[in-house]
């Protein structure tokens, strides 16, 4: 494929910033959702089966079975005025806000549009690239697949491009500070517990990245800060984020609980499961909860439909009294400042 990138006479120009996010379907129409599911689920870092078996499973069973129900869920978060999904709109808003600070900022999605190739083809010659994956924690199904796909596209289209990739920022002071600032105003109302819900991953994904046989519990001594596997252990990184948020908010351990959401299929994922705890909390006299989703920097299907809508319904049907969803960071001014700090390190 021909390289149609523009030329740029200024060889010392500043870095171009590429924001990477996971992506969304083109629309909530069944055909677009089916196309997105096929692209997403046939990624070997999502479903780790051999190629042919993975293709048969996804295209022959999963997508035909799930496309209509998934499309119905996507319709609940579709914005007709912008003809876009929140994840796309918020990511583009982040890019615009960062651009106002004097940076050249572009957006690409791992699945869907705009693609990494779209950005690379328009990248001016003589510019270097800084890739900022909008995933605070390392997981093979989010950070790793986005970064490795981006690297592969760079090798294919721009083999001489100078670039760097920002590491997961799960413990970065600026990220923790803005998360705490986002949550703090909600603590003024009476509550029984702050829930921090992270996107779950299959246990075998964790085993593949850490190369350890892990128990259902996070084993003592696994992935300490000094352990070299900590930089790829999703479970360690999420618990570290939780601990730092709790400390920043000056909350006691019993006031904060971490859970994992979005499990699909019948394999074992990281526990505890949000879906189970939602029904259990009211029985434990935890009837007023605040819930935030730190693994999502932008509101999306999983935060809005799964947690804020469906999660609230489950909680209240089980006897819960007050369910308060705390929106993601999205494109707030403090988050933009935090991203500037993360980019500059």
From Swiss-Prot:
GO molecular-function term, one example from the UniProt record: ferrochelatase activity
Enzyme Commission number, as recorded: 4.98.1.1
A Pfam family it matches: Ferrochelatase
Main subcellular location of this protein, as a coarse class: cytoplasm
GO cellular component: cytoplasm
PANTHER family: FERROCHELATASE, FERROCHELATASE, MITOCHONDRIAL
Functional note: Catalyzes the ferrous insertion into protoporphyrin IX.
Identification of the protein by name: Ferrochelatase
Taxonomic placement: Bacteria, Pseudomonadati, Bacteroidota, Bacteroidia, Bacteroidales
Gene symbol of the encoding locus: hemH
